[in-house]
Amino acid sequence: MAQLEVDLVDTDGTIWSGEARQVSAPASDGEIGILAGHTPVLSVLRHGEVRVIEAGGTVHRWTVEGGFLSVDADQVTVVVDAAEAVASGTSAR
């Protein structure tokens, strides 16, 4: 299965970086889900939860206070104003 290259950053630097099979985020007009092969997109984020699921099923979650998400050629960049880890290392179904 194709993977996404994901970078989650805030004003202090990189929060998380690596390969993932799925990213979901709270876009201003509703939840957005990203899989490999997604069309290029730039989206404003609102307060909510960013979720990254690695290929092995490990789930990383952060509550974010807004920012933006960019997707281009399986590269996902999430830039947030602030982020707080919710849980890490749980398994996706």
Each language-model region and where it sits:
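N-terminal helix initiation/capping motif
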Residues: 1-2
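Compact, glycine-rich, soluble single-domain proteins
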Residues: 5-93
